[in-house]
Amino acid sequence: MAPKAEKKPASKAPAEKKPAAKKTASATGTKKRSKTRKETYSSYIYKVLKQTHPDTGISQKAMSIMNSFVNDIFERIAGEASKLAAYNKKSTISAREIQTAVRLILPGELAKHAVSEGTRAVTKYSSAAN
């Protein structure tokens, strides 16, 4: 058997010296990663709950269900209003498209109340803006 060759460390050419770069917070890893914000209707749902039933609370699961409900209704109304605008060859969704979409999506008496409350809210907003 042949004798084993001695292992020698590989010789390296000296590396070029570069000016030391400033270490930033992200390079050192000390900066905390900011939590991504999740937009919900929770605060608004809570305010309405306190207006109607001041002594009643709401669980996190119930709040999640209510948030899903509001998102669902919003998407339905926005989708229907978008279709109505497209049918009329308009590129803008106005209050009229929203009102018609509400009448189409919500049943009977609920639609009437929603339209009257919506009209009241738009009037209040318009008078405050002027």
UniProtKB/Swiss-Prot annotation:
UniProt modified residues of type Phosphoserine: 11
Compositional bias segments (type: Basic and acidic residues): 1-19
Cellular location(s): Nucleus; Chromosome
One family name in Pfam for this protein: Histone
InterPro entries membership: Histone-fold (IPR009072), Histone_H2A/H2B/H3 (IPR007125), Histone_H2B (IPR000558), HISTONE_H2B_site (IPR055333)
Cross-link Glycyl lysine isopeptide (Lys-Gly) (interchain with G-Cter in SUMO): where in chain: 7-8, 17-18
Region annotation Disordered: where it falls in the sequence: 1-39
Residues recorded as bearing N6-acetyllysine in the entry: 7-8, 12, 17
Maturation and modification: Monoubiquitinated by the UBC2-BRE1 complex to form H2BK123ub1. H2BK123ub1 gives a specific tag for epigenetic transcriptional activation and is also prerequisite for H3K4me and H3K79me formation. H2BK123ub1 also modulates the formation of double-strand breaks during meiosis and is a prerequisite for DNA-damage checkpoint activation. Phosphorylated by STE20 to form H2BS10ph during progression through meiotic prophase. May be correlated with chromosome condensation.
Superkingdom of the organism of origin: Eukaryota
SMART domains: H2B
Molecular function (Gene Ontology), one example: DNA binding
Subunit-level organization: The nucleosome is a histone octamer containing two molecules each of H2A, H2B, H3 and H4 assembled in one H3-H4 heterotetramer and two H2A-H2B heterodimers. The octamer wraps approximately 147 bp of DNA.
Family that this chain belongs to: Belongs to the histone H2B family.
Official protein name in the record: Histone H2B.1
Origin species: Debaryomyces hansenii (strain ATCC 36239 / CBS 767 / BCRC 21394 / JCM 1990 / NBRC 0083 / IGC 2968) (Yeast)
Organism classification: Eukaryota, Fungi, Dikarya, Ascomycota, Saccharomycotina
Gene: HTB1
